[in-house]
Swiss-Prot record:
PROSITE patterns xref list: THIOREDOXIN_1, THIOREDOXIN_2
InterPro entries on file: DSBA-like_thioredoxin_dom (IPR001853), DsbA/DsbL (IPR023205), Thiol_disulfide_DsbA (IPR050824), Thioredoxin-like_sf (IPR036249), Thioredoxin_CS (IPR017937), Thioredoxin_domain (IPR013766)
Localization terms from the record: Periplasm
Gene: dsbA
Job description of the protein: Involved in disulfide-bond formation. Acts by transferring its disulfide bond to other proteins.
GO molecular function: disulfide oxidoreductase activity
Residues of the signal peptide: 1-27
UniProt-recorded name of the protein: Thiol:disulfide interchange protein DsbA
Biological source species: Bordetella avium (strain 197N)
Cystines in this chain: C57-C60
Keyword flag Mitochondrion: no
Keyword list, A-Z: Disulfide bond, Periplasm, Redox-active center, Signal
Length: 209
């Protein structure tokens, strides 16, 4: 059972995560923010699209199927990188969950986590609850436990936090494009579809600049 302090942290995180990213200033009429200076890429030779998300965020859950569909048709020189966000210490296990699933080669469970939390109302907020759930999905529990606390996963969590700070993310979902632009559903007219369309518009701009 979650302690009251952790429950309060997660409640605060859920509130933060449901707020679309709203930058302090951006060009009037634009559905994106220009990053200055541009941020370096972790994937040389590719245009990175960074999807900043939180499993506690219902907007992230809603847009994720659209992101998955978009990823199937994205240009060859574009790579999608999903970046789990922690707005407080109580959310770190959710970051670890994402990277553990990727390390165990179970990306299919990524969208199922959203459904478990938002659709089935499962409280996947600590290692035990997460381990029980992934075991029900056919994941070896011992492997999950070992990877969850591994140095590799901890390193990836640290990198996710660095990226969130560099992009000044204060709400989800948000999308970084080529290290040069940032967009979100709220910037794109409070529209999930609009955000996906804006990503497609920004990719050629990222190539050109």
């Amino acid at each position: 059972m979650l302690s009251s302090s952790i429950s309060r942290l997660l409640a605060a995180a859920a509130l933060a995560a449901t707020t679309f990213f709203a930058p302090a200033s951006h060009a009037e009429g634009n559905a994106y923010v220009t990053l200055s200076p541009a941020l370096p890429s972790d994937t040389p030779g590719k245009i990175e699209v960074l999807e900043f998300f939180a499993y506690t965020c219902p907007h992230c859950a809603a847009i994720e199927p659209m992101v998955e569909d978009w990823a199937k048709t994205k240009p060859e020189d574009v790579v999608l990188k999903q970046v789990p966000i922690a707005f407080n210490a109580g959310m770190k296990p959710l970051q670890q969950l994402y990277y553990t699933l990727m390390a165990l080669d179970r990306p299919d469970l990524h969208i199922k986590v959203f459904n478990a939390i938002h659709g089935e109302r499962k409280r996947l907020f600590d290692k035990k609850a997460m381990g029980d759930w992934v075991a029900s999905q056919g994941v070896d529990r011992a492997k999950f436990d070992a990877v969850f606390d591994s140095f590799s996963v901890q390193t990836q969590v640290q990198r996710a936090n660095q990226l969130a700070e560099a992009y000044r993310i204060d709400g989800t979902p948000s999308f970084g494009v080529g290290g040069k632009f940032l967009t979100s559903p709220v910037l794109a007219g409070n529209s999930y579809e609009g955000a996906i369309k804006e990503i497609n518009k920004l990719i050629p701009m990222a190539r050109a600049k």
